[in-house]
Structures are given as C-alpha cells and as structure tokens.
C-alpha cells in the first residue's frame, strides 16, 4: 500500500495480483488494504487474485476471508484462489514477477499456470 498514489505504483491492467500479509496483519487490516487497492484507477484491469495463506497469529479464518471477498462487489466476477503457500508462510512457493499466466478459480477445480516468465 505504500506505493499507492505515487509514480512507482504499477499499472494493474491485465494483471493477476498476488496478495499476502505478515503476522501482525489482522482481518480488518487486510479488508482495508484490499478496499484501498480496489480504489486505484487501474483496478478495472485486474484479471484475478492469488491470496497467500495467512499466518496463524493473524487469526484469519477461511470464513472471514470469504466474507471479506464477498463484501467487495468489484471482485464478484474475478477468479480468486486463496490460502496459497507463498509470502510469510512455510512452505513457500516462489512466483516470478512479470510474464504471462492463466488463472482459473472454481470451487473444486482451481488452476494457476505460469505460461511465460
């Protein structure tokens, strides 16, 4: 969030955003940060989200995260995969920045495929 409103904030057009938070972040912090991101001018270009698994100390539950996502009408038609092992958790997957990917998010059939990096 520190780059929002600056010349260093990236263009979000045609992007899949990878979001994660640290152990001190609580559900209200994530909710506020997500809403702030939604208000960015290029947010309409976002094509999907991959949300990292929250650390246990954050007390974020699957139900809380689902409620936060459901409360954002701007997310209703976007594919979203949550509880992915990257960021501040272990095990940790490393994803390339940039490149091309395909994201499909269905209840029991989700896929993130890195096509080019």
Give residue ranges: language-model regions.
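A short, acidic, amphipathic alpha-helical segment used as a generic capping/interface helix at domain edges
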Residues: 28-42, 65
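Short, flexible, glycine/charge-rich loop motifs used to bind or transfer phosphoryl groups or to couple energy/partner
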Residues: 5-8, 38-40, 91
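ATP/nucleoside-binding phosphotransfer catalytic cores, i.e., glycine-rich phosphate-binding loops
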Residues: 53-117
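Short, conserved loop/helix-junction motifs that constitute active-site signature segments
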Residues: 40-45, 74
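ATP/pyrophosphate-binding catalytic subdomain of soluble kinases
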Residues: 1-34
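Glycine-rich phosphate/diphosphate-binding loops and the adjacent beta-loop-alpha structural elements
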Residues: 16-24, 50-59
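Structural motif
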Residues: 15-17, 47-48, 78-81
């Amino acid at each position: 969030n520190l780059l929002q409103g600056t010349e260093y904030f990236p263009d979000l057009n045609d992007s899949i955003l990878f979001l994660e938070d640290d152990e001190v972040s609580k559900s209200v912090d994530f909710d506020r940060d997500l809403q702030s991101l939604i208000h960015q001018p290029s947010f309409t270009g976002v094509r999907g989200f991959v949300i990292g698994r929250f650390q246990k100390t954050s007390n974020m539950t699957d139900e809380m995260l689902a409620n936060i996502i459901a409360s954002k009408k701007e997310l209703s038609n976007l594919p979203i995969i949550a509880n992915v092992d990257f960021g501040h958790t272990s095990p940790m997957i490393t994803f390339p920045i940039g490149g091309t990917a395909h994201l499909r998010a269905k209840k029991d059939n989700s896929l993130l495929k890195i096509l080019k990096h």
